[in-house]
Amino acid sequence: MTNAFVYPNVEFIAGVDEVGRGPLVGAVVTAAVILDPHNPIEGLKDSKKLSEKKRLLLAEEIKQKALAWSLGRAEPAEIDKLNILHATMLAMQRAVENLKIQPHFVLVDGNRIPQLPMSAQAVIKGDSLVAEISAASILAKVARDQEMIELDRRYPEYAFAQHKGYPTKLHLERLAQFGVLPEYRRSFAPVKKLLSTLLSKNHEYVFKIQK
């Protein structure tokens, strides 16, 4: 995995990735991981290319073997206030700040980096090229999926365990049928549109009563 990527010549390197920019509900979750070069983990790759069972196994191994790992998040209200890009950067900052070892260098998946007190580099397709970023993507994915499973237990009619909050046909149908929960991102188009429609209908109803 790492042969194609030239690492900076420093001791502690953290990989950072996010999960949950696209869903309509819940937090955007990020992870930061500093791996131990003397305790390698086999099978690290982009979390989206792993089965759920394999992700869960690797997540436990990462937590046991990594020199440091942490999670960061930005809640739906922060996403609505800042927009999803800036909220993701904030969540990444929080993940790095939460590390018990402060890294000398941070490698971030994608083409943007958050403002950090140490040097950082964006790596396109980093979750496939850099072991630390792959590990971060796995931890973030497992954490966010677990949050969706917990939300599914509270609101089984929305089927969150199936679609994980992404705007699938099933999710949009359930959203229209059962309405907007507090955990939804109100600035996201399908949610915003539904709220606008409901508001419009309420106004019409009030107007009819007044007449």
Swiss-Prot record:
Assigned keywords, A-Z: Cytoplasm, Endonuclease, Hydrolase, Manganese, Metal-binding, Nuclease
RNA-binding keyword on record: no
Cofactor binding note from Swiss-Prot or TrEMBL: Manganese or magnesium. Binds 1 divalent metal ion per monomer in the absence of substrate. May bind a second metal ion after substrate binding.
Enzyme Commission number(s): 3.1.26.4
Reactions listed under catalytic activity: Endonucleolytic cleavage to 5'-phosphomonoester
Name of the protein in its database record: Ribonuclease HII
Cofactor(s) listed in the protein's UniProt record: Mn(2+); Mg(2+)
Binding site for a divalent metal cation: 17-18, 109
Every RNase H type-2 domain range: 11-200
Subcellular location: Cytoplasm
Source species, domain of life: Bacteria
Organism: Histophilus somni (strain 129Pt) (Haemophilus somnus)
Enzyme class: hydrolase
A GO term for molecular function: RNA binding
Family from the record: Belongs to the RNase HII family.
Keyword GTP-binding found: no
SUPFAM superfamilies: Ribonuclease H-like (SSF53098)
Chief location: cytoplasm
Cysteine pairings via disulfide bonds: none
Gene Ontology BP annotations: DNA replication, removal of RNA primer; mismatch repair
Transmembrane segments: none
Job of this protein: Endonuclease that specifically degrades the RNA of RNA-DNA hybrids.
GO cellular component, one term: ribonuclease H2 complex
HAMAP family with a match to the protein in the record: RNase_HII_B
